[in-house]
Amino acid sequence: MLHRSSPRSFLPTALLLFALTGCAAPTAPASEPSRDTHGDIDGAAELAEPALGLTSIDGDGRVSHLDLLDETTADLGTVRAPVATHSDGRYLFSADDAGVSIVDSGVWTWDHVDHFHYYRAEARILGDVAGEGVATVATSNSSTTGGTGLFFPGSGEAVLLDTEALSKGEIAETFRLTVDPGPGLVVPAGSFAAVAAGDEVTLHAADGTRVGDPTACPSPAGTITTRVGAVIGCQDSALLIAVEDEQPVVERIPYPAGSTAPRATAFANREGRPTVAGVAEGAGVWLLDTRERTWTLLPTAQPVLQAVAVDDRDANVLVLTADGSVRVLDGETGAERAASVPLVAASLAAGLPVNLVADQQRAYLNGPAEDRLWEIDFADGARVAREFAPERSPLFFAETGR
């Protein structure tokens, strides 16, 4: 049974989130399987609006879910103490040196390109996937179809999970391959997956069978999936992997000629949108437009720690700067539009994990040292719309239901 309580909120409950999901694109996602279930799963209830929430894990592995509509909190159980987490907007993948624990928040959105479907099911902890070393996790834009990739650096094991099985409460590996230990990625792309390790990327069918020839990718790091395809960051470029005529296609997007700015090693966006952001350490923010196949460098006056491309009509780009502030940049010029007060200075000083996420209307930020979660209206002067003081310190969190 879920135990619900109300967190302390520092603004009136009338300031509730009215978040809308992203704008429709004219074509279907290139990297998703063709089978269309509208995200429906047996036992799930379809909703009239997204059931948005903040699902968090504290330092002891206790999992909580804050409902952003009624501000109640549910205790979802306990996983092993996390070292890192990843989320696709439904599941949280909590990694430590022994494997990955999977939490199903029970809320998700199905993007049908020209409209959306919203669902709620039972929230639960699904179990663990064993592996050596803190895994990197890669997901697609679907929480009910396709695959989820895990790469364990200690053993060099590349694992692809069946995401449809996850949506039914089961953990099923469709392949587990072994390459050289070290950094790596397993990136789902439709019914295929890319394994990035060493200095190359290989493509595989869902059963692990190699497909085609390897593609060079020096020092692979960072991945994200947009409506256009799956992105893998390389030292000199990004690889864009899409599925055309039921076959994977790899396209290289090189950094601009003559650029001396550091490459991006992580990417973030409003889920599914074609433009993604990455930090060019010490230089600013890289924007990668996967639809236009272009990079743009936005120089910044403040050192940037994280960057998120909202990719909305106003081309908003959100950054977390070294002073703990959230700043709103013009994605076309790099000009600063607004800035919050420093919110997470204590967490940054303590070396604690802080994460900035965004949807179409709001941004969210955790402060483990401050014991706070913030909702920020980035279109209204980076105003703090709501501030929550959860009972458990939010060491890691994700916005779920989107």
Feature-to-residue mapping (PLM):
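Bacterial signal peptide processing site
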Residues: 24-27
